[in-house]
Amino acid sequence: MTKSPNLTVAVIGTGFGQAVHIPALQYHQQTQAIAIYHRDLAKAQEVAKSNDLAYSYNNLEELLANPEVQAVTIASPPFLHYEMAKQAILAGKHVLLEKPMTLRVEETIELYHLARQREVQVIPDFEFRFVPAWQYVAELLGQGILGQLKLIKVDWLVGSRANPNRAWNWYAQREKGGGALGALASHTFDYLHWLFGPAQSLAANLSVAIAERPDPLDNNRLKPVTAEDTALISLTLANDVPCQINITSVAHGGRGHWLEIYGEKGSLVLGSDNLKDYVHGFRIFHHPVGQPMQELTVPTRLDFPKVFADGRLAPVVRVVDEWVQSINQKRTPTPSLRHGVYSQLLMDLTKQAHQEKHWVAVPDLDRLLAQ
């Protein structure tokens, strides 16, 4: 099939941006990555050359001034998201924004209103909404397969940061948006909102298991880790349904990523023990009351059109597709920056609940955005 792109995109960030955003944009029939940004121009030029991109920049204003750039993806460290996204929106560029959205919900709300004023489409990269097994669970819940819900539990227990010799960088610093909240809980807050609706209140305990890490830019001197690597969060959902979230990035041999849903008619379990790929490997188990547990097969109509060795790529292609369609149809994408505000809100409230050591109420999202 001949590619006929109608959205030319600049990628900001050479980590996840280079590994996932560029190939996703190059694969999608209606998009083309044409530019890359990195603070080190030599690095940007190297990435541009290896990916056949026309432009490389270490100056964001120059990138945004390029009339050939219609949109940007932002995969820089979280502490840069707000300013970069704000500049892009003000320049009239559509934005695909990595999570966490910003460092504070007030910043995300500002981006939400700014995007509406400038009539640009901003989509958060909440990938689990686009994974077939998760989509099927959403359908089953919508059909009322479990009846009235009684308990929801999330375990996301991985060892990506379990090695104490892993380098100290922005990820180790809470003030720069590092930690398990931004990396993992940002997704969890979104998919719980998608599947079950808004939370009413929450309580939390955040902890740091590995207190120091070596800084390779400072002779491997040990530096303090201020960003949580473990988060235990309790939510109260609609109808007072309890939800327990257990997240850690320092679990050697952790069980992976599991969502357990218990209701009056039985239970659903969605999970993967694949610690090397957070998309591949999800399975669904249904245990109706009075019957044996059975594994469910995801309908082929929900399958990815193409799967890749890197499991992250297929759902991001679907995110890109929703983004492109929303731009072409001049409509708000799903998920939207409104959902990004909600995820950021719960991240902020989690920190507040931990610091104050008591339950905190979750404000109504529409009222928050109307202020």
UniProtKB/Swiss-Prot annotation:
Superkingdom per UniProt: Bacteria
Alphabetical list of InterPro entries matching this protein: Gfo/Idh/MocA-like_OxRdtase_C, Gfo/Idh/MocA-like_OxRdtase_N, Gfo/Idh/MocA_oxidrdct_glycsds, NAD(P)-bd_dom_sf
Keywords, ordered alphabetically: Oxidoreductase
Known EC number: 1.-.-.-
GO molecular-function term, one example from the UniProt record: nucleotide binding
Keyword Glycoprotein (UniProt): no
Top class in the EC scheme: oxidoreductase
UniProt record similarity statement: Belongs to the Gfo/Idh/MocA family.
UniProt name for this protein: Uncharacterized oxidoreductase sll0816
Organism this protein belongs to: Synechocystis sp. (strain ATCC 27184 / PCC 6803 / Kazusa)
